[in-house]
Amino acid sequence: MINRIVSFFILCLVLCIPLCVAYFHSGELMMRFVFFWPFFMSIMWIVGGVYFWVYRERHWPWGENAPAPQLKDNPSISIIIPCFNEEKNVEETIHAALAQRYENIEVIAVNDGSTDKTRAILDRMAAQIPHLRVIHLAQNQGKAIALKTGAAAAKSEYLVCIDGDALLDRDAAAYIVEPMLYNPRVGAVTGNPRIRTRSTLVGKIQVGEYSSIIGLIKRTQRIYGNVFTVSGVIAAFRRSALAEVGYWSDDMITEDIDISWKLQLNQWTIFYEPRALCWILMPETLKGLWKQRLRWAQGGAEVFLKNMTRLWRKENFRMWPLFFEYCLTTIWAFTCLVGFIIYAVQLAGVPLNIELTHIAATHTAGILLCTLCLLQFIVSLMIENRYEHNLTSSLFWIIWFPVIFWMLSLATTLVSFTRVMLMPKKQRARWVSPDRGILRG
């Protein structure tokens, strides 16, 4: 009951902040925040991405002719693949995992109660491949339980966790484990997912997202201390760190965000390794994209509510930038909503003590935002072209994705944050088969 009261109070507070600004100061100030918060964050991402590239990334070996990574003391690596109804993808995924140039690996596929032919495919492959172990769960328990099961069965201290449709690059496992060998406080490393599905407008737009937004965000967050979340499709973990925090939570809709915060709130560090490439399938329909992003946004809100009080301990001060960024982005979304409502009420002729003359960007603000989109594209293209040379084929969509990114964030934040604050609950988070694209690119 207390959690419900607190969460309802938070929702009211988020709504009241823009209303108070508009009422006690001016509606124009409120709308300036709407226009310039994305502007400020984009500058942060550009500066952070460039800094990470100049002082770290550009010095790292990479390329077709680069030698296979040599890991200190030749540790074993366990690649864990949780699978649910992956009959179309799992065989290709396992073959890519086994094709690593680093040889001291084992692959563990966890069949999470699949109802298609996944079980039969895994059993056939396990009989033929010595380095492959298969675990079958009788019923669908959710990705968190599947990952826990794989971790319990693994022989290695270093766990590389990927989705059942993900294709690892030939050196991804070695690259993503390497930072943990040189820093004993690195508890997890997040990789660099790349989009395979590009046959529709929705697919091409996501190429722009992962090229011009996601990579810059990860680089920037790594520079100022902590990462909001590891990638759910490719991440490596130190098993002792997972054991310390209780592994993955089975009641959180996004186990990747939750485990990232659990590790960092226990003083473990998360590193970003852009050379750990992983090729993934993504939604290519608007319905599939909406469901996926709504789930991501809801996961962020759940983690925020879960850790809100713990964040204020002085030992967690490095998490404060992430906390304030999340709070301000959420307030930004509700400020947009309040602005639209006020403007609509004024158009209807209802008298208000708040004056709002426009909700669209001014000429100057529009030019600034468009220029920043172009600059962000140029920076991301210069950095990401190292890993994916055909990005110019998606040139048009990449340029405009920053605008689409913020609009999508606006809609999903409004829906998910309201849902979580009004209906906080604890139940097992189980997965369903997502939209995996219409045609593989």
From Swiss-Prot:
Q: Which GO terms describe its biological process?
A: cell adhesion involved in biofilm formation
Q: Which UniProt keywords apply?
A: Cell inner membrane, Cell membrane, Glycosyltransferase, Membrane, Transferase, Transmembrane, Transmembrane helix
- Gene knockout outcome: Cells lacking this gene do not synthesize PGA.
Q: Which Pfam families does this entry report, sorted A to Z?
A: Glycos_transf_2
Q: Which segments does the topology annotation call Periplasmic?
A: 1-4, 54-330, 384-394
Localization in the cell: Cell inner membrane
Q: Does the keyword Amino-acid biosynthesis apply?
A: no
Where is the chain membrane-spanning? 5-25, 33-53, 331-351, 363-383, 395-415
- Does the UniProt entry include the keyword Iron-sulfur? no
Where does it sit, as one GO cellular component term?
Answer: plasma membrane
Q: Which residues lie on this side of the membrane: Cytoplasmic?
A: 26-32, 352-362, 416-441
What are its E.C. numbers?
A: 2.4.1.-
Which GO MF terms are attached to this record?
A: acetylglucosaminyltransferase activity
Q: How does it sit in the membrane?
A: Multi-pass membrane protein
Question: What's this chain's function?
Answer: Probable N-acetylglucosaminyltransferase that catalyzes the polymerization of single monomer units of UDP-N-acetylglucosamine to produce the linear homomer poly-beta-1,6-N-acetyl-D-glucosamine (PGA), a biofilm adhesin polysaccharide.
Q: Which family does it belong to?
A: Belongs to the glycosyltransferase 2 family.
Its protein name is Poly-beta-1,6-N-acetyl-D-glucosamine synthase
